[in-house]
Design a protein with these regions (language model features):
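N-terminal signal peptide c-region/cleavage motif recognized by signal peptidases
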Residues: 18-20
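Bacterial N-terminal signal peptides that target proteins for export
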Residues: 1-10
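Hydrophobic helical h-region of N-terminal Sec-dependent signal peptides
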Residues: 10-12, 16
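N-terminal secretory signal peptides
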Residues: 23-64, 115-124
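Compact alpha-helical subdomains of small soluble proteins
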Residues: 54-124
């Protein structure tokens, strides 16, 4: 029965190793990721459909991240959502079409609503 001793010793050692604490997402994380995705979509569509009238959506995303001060994991998820939004529309459009312009209008409305909801529900 000697082989059980090393296994027990290994189990005891594993139990003594500190486990890093898992970060808990804030309750608005899902909405933030959706907002990041929308901003990425707008970052792609704006130069196609409304190049002179829109703000720099990438800078808006950077400002949002700076304001929220997420940990590295959340920061990467927000950046991933932004990139996913950009990529989704980059696969669909090469020029501004009626559909692209309509998508941009809907995205602007959704971004405004999402930002307002996050602020009204979670701002201090």
């Amino acid at each position: 029965m000697r082989p059980a001793r090393p296994i027990r010793a290994l189990l005891v050692c594993l139990l003594l190793v500190p486990v890093p604490a898992l970060a808990v997402d804030p309750p608005y994380q899902g909405e933030m990721e959706r907002l990041a995705e929308i901003l990425g979509s707008l970052y792609f569509l704006a130069p196609l459909c409304r190049p002179s009238s829109e703000p720099d959506w990438r800078q808006q995303m950077a400002d949002l991240i700076e304001l929220d001060q997420p940990d590295d994991d959340r920061r990467q998820r927000l950046a991933g959502a932004f990139n996913a939004g950009y990529g989704a529309y980059a696969r669909l459009y090469r020029a501004c079409t009626v559909s692209a312009d309509e998508a941009m209008t809907r995205l602007l409305l959704e971004a405004e609503k999402t930002a307002r909801d996050i602020h009204s529900r979670f701002a201090e």
